[in-house]
Amino acid sequence: IQVDSVCNEVIVPAPNLAPDIAESARRAALTIASELGVTGVMAAELFETPGRGPGFLINELAMRPHNSGHWTQDGSVTSQFEQHLRAVLDLPLGSTDRVAEATVMKNVLGGENQNLYGAFPEVMAAYPEAKVHLYGKSVRPGRKVGHVNVTGPSESIDRLRQVANEAAAVIRDHGAAENA
């Protein structure tokens, strides 16, 4: 889910995505990777376009682990980072099976809070199911500085989204009132 042309949230599996469009997108990505001779992870960021062409547009190709695949750190048996290393080192690839029915990844964008790690105790106490990953980058408003993953049953997708969004907001806004 994009907001202001920035990846804001990833929901796995994609809700309400028609199986034929998912299969067509999978085939297109595999064809592109094969034709380009890709070794390692290739992310194909797609936008669904119901009723137009194949039902999707390719927005971005990245020949590396990508923000849209960060959900794999907690939602897949093998993360995109480990899978990339396995591929480039010519090791057997790991399982791509999901460890839960659904995963929500919410990006943490920089705000006024400069001490992102100061929010950890609050997030861990309020949202024990949220897994926080911070990148160690300097904080600037709107810059991706981390993400939150939450996994669970697919029938709880609304709750997973709520937890991911609230946890990310706590990190972004922690201490903002004292800094104002």
Model-derived features: positions:
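Phosphate-binding core of ATP-grasp and ATP-grasp-like enzymes
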Residues: 1-17, 22-58, 62-69, 86-95, ...
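Short beta-strand-to-turn element immediately C-terminal to the catalytic PLP-Schiff-base lysine
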Residues: 13, 49, 74, 149-152
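Sparse recognition of residues in long alpha-helices and their boundaries
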Residues: 45, 77, 100-101
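Peripheral (often C-terminal) accessory segments that flank ATP-dependent C-N-forming ligase machineries
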Residues: 86-180
